[in-house]
Amino acid sequence: MRDSTPLIHPTAVIDPSATLADDVRVGAFSLIGADVQIGAGTEVGPHCSIHGPTRIGRNNRFIGHAAIGGEPQDKKYAGERTELVIGDGNVIREFVTINRGTGGGGGITVVGNDNWMLAYTHVAHDCHVGNHCVFSNNTTLAGHVTVGDYVIISGFAGAHQFCRIGAHAFLGMGALTNGDVPPFTMVGSESLGRPRGINSEGLKRRGFDAERITAIKRAYRTLYVAGLPLADAKLQLAEQAKSSDDVRGMLEFIEAAERPLLR
């Protein structure tokens, strides 16, 4: 039977300058503002607001009451043109907020593909989120945070502005990080999170074999358990990286740090 439900609810407000693919659905009382582009297969649920400049890819779902592409919550923002770019296949749950960038922070907020952002998640200005991440309820990313692929952030956890969270990392419930989190690292559920091993279970689920996981564990022990100064730990990691691409990625992440490493 053919679905007779209209694609655009009669109570939705669509700015004439917005560009929506032919099969985009927009629910009741939602607002699509000026300079917004939405790709094919995307569903915008009821009571959502999407402001431009914002570009949204294909097959995304905004469940309801999401506030997307709003002005950055930064007092230095002076109305300059900035944007938000969202990729494909993301699920954005109730009351999620994702803000545009700032002129001083690169001018763009980016969300990749196939991410799940659960209720009340906040992604601030100039954040860059990778692919296949899960942000549980009330996850909070301050401005300029970078999140790698396959990161899981538990409920009520958050990251200080300018922090980086490496690929495959895991932040426990309520964990707050004010330093860079290396790839594969688990952060404990303390008020100020501390390293608590590697995300072994997540790596197994993603197809990492025992040899790769063993190399990552060894690198973690070098960095966090051996009691070495960071400079000495990096020298040992450089040796280990000769036989492990994963360790090489960890070392490159550490070398690129502009904030202190979570220790």
Curated annotation (Swiss-Prot):
GO terms for biological process: lipid A biosynthetic process. GO terms for cellular component: cytoplasm; membrane. Pathway: Glycolipid biosynthesis; lipid IV(A) biosynthesis; lipid IV(A) from (3R)-3-hydroxytetradecanoyl-[acyl-carrier-protein] and UDP-N-acetyl-alpha-D-glucosamine: step 1/6. GO terms for molecular function: acyl-[acyl-carrier-protein]-UDP-N-acetylglucosamine O-acyltransferase activity. It is found in: Cytoplasm. SUPFAM superfamilies: Trimeric LpxA-like enzymes. Involved in the biosynthesis of lipid A, a phosphorylated glycolipid that anchors the lipopolysaccharide to the outer membrane of the cell. It comes from Xanthomonas axonopodis pv. citri (strain 306). It catalyses: a (3R)-hydroxyacyl-[ACP] + UDP-N-acetyl-alpha-D-glucosamine = a UDP-3-O-[(3R)-3-hydroxyacyl]-N-acetyl-alpha-D-glucosamine + holo-[ACP]. This is Acyl-[acyl-carrier-protein]--UDP-N-acetylglucosamine O-acyltransferase. Homotrimer. Its main location: cytoplasm. Its EC number is 2.3.1.129.
